[in-house]
Amino acid sequence: MQQNNSVPEFILLGLTQDPLRQKIVFVIFLIFYMGTVVGNMLIIVTIKSSRTLGSPMYFFLFYLSFADSCFSTSTAPRLIVDALSEKKIITYNECMTQVFALHLFGCMEIFVLILMAVDRYVAICKPLRYPTIMSQQVCIILIVLAWIGSLIHSTAQIILALRLPFCGPYLIDHYCCDLQPLLKLACMDTYMINLLLVSNSGAICSSSFMILIISYIVILHSLRNHSAKGKKKALSACTSHIIVVILFFGPCIFIYTRPPTTFPMDKMVAVFYTIGTPFLNPLIYTLRNAEVKNAMRKLWHGKIISENKG
């Protein structure tokens, strides 16, 4: 049997084998990906350019948008190109790189969502100490720790993937490389590796989700003591965060907290959190946030005026 040191390439089966549906997949996900990149880049540029968006919440939103763009880019371009390709070939090195990038930016998104929840908790439950606790220096340290944690997680995942011995046929029943579909191709007992996968990715997803839900329950409970205006503003911000948390963590928990059994719905579930959620995040955070919308209007209004003067 050939093992992973001699695997030249894999073949991705993609979302569908039907030619007509592949064209539909191409159009839909091209729109989704372009929307994701444009939306998140718009948020990044707005936060960097606006003086009114200097609070820790927008500091973390900047990194969430960056992680969203990179997370989607780790899978979407190949899915789009493969939709029009007769043979969806990915080399072994490209596959391992995709596994690493997927987990690096996916984990970073999880950690940033936790930091945003911490920020909301301090802002609402400890408003007098907020400037001290969430100082710029503290926020930078937290983001650096998030990057370090993400790097450790993705390195652990790639080590597991590199240890897998593969035997032909090298057909991955997915649109991207990830540990779950790769485990199905391994010519070895994958019980221990799957246990490590669940204890790593599964534990991160499940524990982070529980931490986030509990923190937002505490935040919402504490809003009873706030004024109507303050309650409305805080509730709007928290609702946006809760929507993002549920949309992202639901599919992640489904994928990473069970044995490596392939269900027909797995690929569509993965599409939802790798491409769907990064597309929806900019819409959720801009449509429900008056400060971001106003900053965007000022930014582009000023840009139009400067162009007209020029």
From Swiss-Prot:
Q: Which SUPFAM superfamilies match?
A: Family A G protein-coupled receptor-like (SSF81321)
Highest taxon of the lineage:
Eukaryota
Q: Does the keyword Disulfide bond apply?
A: yes
CDD domains, sorted? 7tmA_OR4A-like
**Which residues are exposed on the Cytoplasmic face of the membrane?**
48-55, 119-137, 218-233, 288-310
Which residue intervals are topologically Extracellular? Answer: 1-23, 78-98, 157-193, 257-267
Instruction: Provide the glycosylation site positions.
Output: 4
Q: What is its main location?
A: membrane
Q: Where are the transmembrane segments?
A: 24-47, 56-77, 99-118, 138-156, 194-217, 234-256, 268-287
Cystine pairs annotated here are 95-187
Q: How does it sit in the membrane?
A: Multi-pass membrane protein
Cross-referenced Gene3D superfamilies, in alphabetical order? Rhodopsin 7-helix transmembrane proteins (1.20.1070.10)
Q: GO molecular function terms here?
A: G protein-coupled receptor activity; olfactory receptor activity
Q: Describe the function of this protein.
A: Odorant receptor.
The record's family statement is:
Belongs to the G-protein coupled receptor 1 family.
Q: Could you tell me what this protein is called?
A: Olfactory receptor 4C11
Lineage of the species this protein comes from: Eukaryota, Metazoa, Chordata, Craniata, Vertebrata
What gene does the UniProt entry assign to this protein? OR4C11
